[in-house]
């Protein structure tokens, strides 16, 4: 069944057909701009108007019409070239009758090319005086209304291409995201790390505690998982002698969607041979401080009306932070029964596979996590919840592991990596026991990883850091789906015409 066109769409289709009648391709041909709008603005924005007029600077630009005004034999329009806009002056006497008629029939959203000279208007706005007006692409749908269209965030997430056209904040977020990725890559490259790629399809579930997506490999006739972490393949590379490696890529976890979770998300994992948790803590701090300095020129910035200060990273053990909030000291040798009793008293839900370590983690989640606003390294996680981390020598119930918390959320996870293959096998067996008790996030036994460890992995420090949350933090964005170009949304496969899609910019086709 054909989609019913709105009144505005019908008019645009008619204009498309009119272009065809005069042998103009509504969807254009190759057009080579001499400048981007950004380049023109950077070079000539501050130029003297008289000098500009005398210089007769010729430019050739392309962009989308986002504003159009004027009647009679002359008019103005604003061209948008991604994140930059510029005014153009179109006059019948300069472009000719045929081109001027095409200009008059253009709609907001159409893509055009203009050739002409730069000048400044009486209000000192840098403008292109058009000598040629070239139609490049007909937009058959109108742009959303500035107010209603931008209020419906879910609709914009589903139609990110429209969001990018009309929402400057969205464009700025993704420009900043690109910069963040660039700076992080540069940081690790400059530290001597080697960027690598490891498989997205993995035969064994491991490297994190999470529910996986499962798919079937027809050629091999076996099930594979979309990776939930890159940890184990990267540590195999450490075994192979790549002493400094990192990978930036997507992970997949078949879990819930909320303001800080998306099933498909980006991380960096980095591994450094002959290092430990403290070295990785220092590396993480240095990376984030350099990142803030490059973006803001300082170590302080605002997130959701909270002042965040990267000049100082606090450090506290998990059990000490719980004691501070609850008075309970989990360094005491509590039995499982005592821990269960404490959990019941504090209304903490306990699953069948829970041990003392899981209960400690649950206390931390309930009483501490949301209070950690400024950057805080929380270290000393229980052994039972850290199957890939080395035991702490002073207290083997805990591990040499830390998580970084900012604004009440986890941003990074790091260990002194367990490199004892015999102990690692015991940990994997414990994970299998947890899985039998209902922990569907427990790791599988990865025999190939154990085989690699048997060849000898040097003492190693490892880091995993979520990049989407980091972009949220550094762009002051409240929802993770607003820092991912194409996030998962409900009913994404169903094409529906939202009411806002038919509300167009004021005087869209009459300006």
From Swiss-Prot:
Gene Ontology terms for molecular function: ATP binding; lysine-tRNA ligase activity; magnesium ion binding; tRNA binding
Note accompanying the cofactor annotation: Binds 3 Mg(2+) ions per subunit.
Keyword Cell inner membrane: no
E.C. code: 6.1.1.6
Disulfide feature: none
Annotated compartments: Cytoplasm
Quaternary data: Homodimer.
Family membership: Belongs to the class-II aminoacyl-tRNA synthetase family.
Protein name: Lysine--tRNA ligase
Gene name for this UniProt entry: lysS
């Amino acid at each position: 069944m054909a989609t019913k066109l709105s009144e505005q769409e019908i008019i645009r289709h008619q204009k498309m057909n009119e272009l065809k009648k005069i042998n103009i391709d509504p969807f254009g041909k190759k057009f080579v701009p001499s400048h981007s709008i950004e380049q023109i603005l950077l070079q000539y924005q501050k130029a003297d108007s008289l000098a500009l007029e005398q210089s007769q600077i010729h430019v050739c630009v392309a962009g989308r019409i986002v504003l159009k005004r004027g009647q009679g034999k002359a008019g103005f329009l604003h061209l948008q070239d991604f994140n930059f806009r510029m005014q153009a002056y179109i006059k019948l006497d300069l472009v000719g009758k045929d081109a001027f008629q095409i200009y008059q029939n253009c709609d907001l959203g159409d893509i055009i090319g203009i050739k002409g000279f730069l000048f400044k208007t009486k209000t000192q706005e840098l403008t292109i005086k058009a000598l040629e007006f070239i139609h490049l692409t007909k937009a058959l749908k109108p742009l959303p209304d500035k107010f209603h269209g931008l209020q419906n965030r879910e609709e914009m997430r589903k139609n990110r291409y429209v969001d990018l056209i009309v929402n400057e904040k969205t464009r700025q977020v993704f420009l900043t995201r690109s910069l963040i990725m660039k700076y992080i890559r540069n940081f690790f490259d400059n530290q001597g790390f080697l960027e690598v790629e490891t498989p997205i399809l993995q035969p064994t579930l491991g490297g994190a505690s999470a529910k996986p997506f499962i798919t079937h490999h027809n050629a091999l006739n076996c099930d594979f998982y979309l990776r939930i972490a890159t940890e184990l393949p990267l540590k195999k590379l450490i075994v192979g002698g790549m002493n400094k490696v990192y990978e930036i890529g997507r992970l997949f976890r078949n879990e819930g969607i909320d303001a800080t979770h998306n099933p498909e998300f980006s991380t960096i994992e980095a591994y450094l041979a002959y290092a430990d948790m403290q070295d990785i803590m220092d590396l993480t701090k240095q990376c984030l401080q350099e990142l803030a300095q490059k973006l803001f020129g300082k170590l302080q910035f605002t997130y959701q009306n909270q002042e965040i200060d990267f000049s100082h990273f606090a450090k506290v053990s998990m059990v000490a932070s719980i004691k501070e909030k609850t008075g309970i000291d989990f360094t005491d040798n509590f039995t499982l029964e005592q821990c269960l009793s404490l959990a019941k008293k504090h209304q903490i839900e306990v699953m069948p596979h829970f041990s003392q370590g899981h209960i400690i983690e649950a206390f931390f989640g309930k009483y501490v996590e949301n209070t950690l606003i400024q950057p805080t390294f929380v270290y000393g996680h229980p052994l039972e919840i850290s199957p890939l981390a080395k035991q702490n020598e002073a207290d083997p119930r805990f591990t040499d592991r830390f998580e970084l918390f900012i604004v009440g959320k986890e941003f990074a996870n790091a260990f002194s990596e367990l490199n004892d293959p015999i102990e690692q096998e015991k940990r994997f067996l414990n994970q299998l026991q947890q899985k039998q008790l209902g922990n569907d996030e427990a790791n599988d036994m990865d025999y190939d990883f154990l085989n690699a460890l048997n060849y000898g992995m040097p003492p190693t420090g490892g880091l995993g850091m979520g990049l989407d949350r980091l972009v949220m933090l550094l762009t002051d964005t409240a929802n993770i789906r607003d820092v991912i170009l194409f996030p998962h949304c409900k009913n994404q496969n169903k094409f529906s015409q939202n009411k806002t899609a038919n509300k167009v910019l004021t005087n869209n086709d009459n300006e």
